[in-house]
A protein has these predicted regions:
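Coil residues (strongly favoring Ser/Thr
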Residues: 45, 53-56, 133, 164
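Bacterial N-terminal signal peptides
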Residues: 27-33
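Chitinase-like catalytic core of GlcNAc-active glycosidases
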Residues: 134-179, 189-205, 209-211, 218, ...
Length: 346
């Protein structure tokens, strides 16, 4: 895998990160502005509104028959099959470091030398264990094994698969700390059905789990980084069946499947996602911003559409990108409803 190719991928990833911030703002912003060179983000003007007042008592309003009814309150915890023996969730909390060793810009996993990275991971584990003494913390390394690209590549799929030597290297780091490993897939213009089978030899190990990033699943035919991609229930159900088959074939404990999300359309028809006791599903709130923005996105895209378990991503740099922004503390994340059982640092 050429470093230059990953650098090119990070240009598109930076563009996508700009979109990520803007989508987290929701109705406060209109439109989408991409910039390959500007660090500043262009905000559209927002409309101001004031509450109407009356000199005399205001007349009673007749309810609008066409008004949108209030959505029912989401049901948490989700009614799901009882956990099988060996299940990690919900009686543990996973704490993962995310990235790729070939790039210092894709996350903490590749930003610092391995020994320093593992030491920092252990310190985070200790910090989270103190914040919630009732829930054991399980460390993990979350490796992007299929990286979306800004160029088509030889097969025109706009994605690059990491070679086995890199995957085994990161797996060795995980083994040193008795940590889990997640293999993360950015599908590009390929299909989830084509991008999972080659990972079977890694997923056959009891401590290796799967993640898929809908942001880079380009079903519309657009290039990665130009628009935000999406997955539907059929895609996720295929991944669930694939993992369940591996659990049965190799007689393994249940697998964890992480699906990233930070917009409405990244995950479509969530009610059609089937629950299988052999696969534990985490919807991971993946957007970056200040605490109010992140809490709002969690409520809108994760809490409001229950699947099974929830996750929350924290960005060491982007969550502090602008003046007044800061990284959320473990205590603040644990105050979310429902409490995330998967924590990821990038």
């Amino acid at each position: 895998m050429e470093i230059g190719r990953l650098r090119a991928r990070w240009l598109t990833d930076y563009r996508a990160s700009q979109m990520r911030y803007r989508h987290m703002l929701g109705p406060a912003l209109a439109g989408l502005v991409l910039s390959a060179t500007a660090d500043a983000q262009t905000r559209d003007s927002t409309r101001s509104s004031s509450r109407a007042t009356c000199d005399s008592p205001c007349p009673k309003r007749t309810p609008n028959a066409s008004a949108r009814p209030r959505a029912p309150k989401p049901e948490w915890p989700v009614r799901a099959p009882a956990p099988l023996p060996g299940s990690i969730l919900p009686n543990n909390r996973i704490l993962a470091y995310y990235g790729n060793p070939l790039s210092k810009r894709m996350g903490i996993l590749g930003e610092v030398p391995p020994d320093e990275m593992l030491d920092r991971l252990q310190k985070e584990v200790t910090r989270w264990a103190k914040a919630d003494t009732a829930t054991p913390i399980v460390p993990a390394l979350h490796l992007i094994v299929t990286v979306a690209q800004g160029h088509p590549g030889k097969d025109g799929m706009y994605r690059a698969r990491m070679d086995s030597s890199l995957i085994e290297r990161v797996y060795g780091w995980a083994q040193r700390k008795n940590a889990l490993m997640f293999v993360d897939v950015q599908v590009g213009k390929s299909h989830v059905r084509a991008e999972l089978p080659w990972l079977e030899k890694y997923l056959a190990r009891p401590n290796v789990h799967l993640a898929i990033d809908p942001e880079f699943y380009m079903k519309t035919g657009k290039k990665p980084g130009t628009v935000i991609g999406s997955m539907n229930d059929d895609d996720i159900n295929y991944a669930i069946d694939f993992l369940a088959g591996i659990v049965d074939k190799y007689k393994l404990p249940p697998k964890v499947l992480v699906i990233h999300r930070f917009t409405q359309n990244m995950l479509r028809n969530y009610k059609g996602i089937k629950l299988d006791p052999r696969v534990q599903i985490v919807i991971n709130m993946d957007g970056w911003g200040n605490p109010p923005l992140k809490r709002g996105s969690y409520d809108r895209y994760v809490y409001a559409e229950p699947v099974q378990f929830t996750g929350f991503k924290l960005f060491y740099k982007n969550d502090k990108r602008f003046a007044g922004w800061r990284l959320m503390t473990p205590e603040e994340v644990l105050a979310l409803i429902p409490r995330p059982v998967y924590i990821q640092y990038q």
